[in-house]
Amino acid sequence: MLYKGGHNLKISPIIETDRLVLRNFKEKDIDILYSYRNNKNCSKYQRWENTSKEFLTNFIKEERLKTISNDSLQLAIAHKKNDDLVGDIFIARKEKCITIGYTVDFKHHRKGYAHEIINALISYLFDNFKGYELVALVHPDNEPSKNLLEKLNFESEGYAEKLDSIVYCLKSFKWLHGNKRKNNDDKFKFIR
């Protein structure tokens, strides 16, 4: 895996894995983003409402200006070979907590993409934000997402009624003392 940039996360690609890149959105992503953001199979566990192409065009322009240092941001998950959009990841940092969220286009479910890119993202975040805790909110009926987080050693902290979500947490010390070695056979290269 290759990491580019520091806390800025404005350089693209930010993370490369064997099959994927995590990068800023591009205008060419709008059609695929529109398609899966309006697909019931992807949106049934999400909090967004159907979105127009005009909204997504403005969204992409705004997201490209943000950094993890001072904002929440959404990044694109794309195929490494053809740069086509596969899904997206949300990252928000506050104090010593980073919240992540993710969506993979329904056409790409069950291919291991979410595990691959989130595993790399966890390593990136814990290497760059020492002592932080990662949090993910999951709809109670979203079994694939719950299974994914548990496979990555997130632990359920219980149900948050106001959010209608199960709160999953991963502490950096837990990741750095076992999970990183267990789930990640790749070598890391950091570029600053």
Task: Mark where each language-model region is.
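Short loop/turn motifs at secondary-structure junctions and domain boundaries
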Residues: L65-N70
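Acyl-donor (CoA/ACP) binding surface of acyl/acetyltransferases
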Residues: M1-K44, Q74-R192
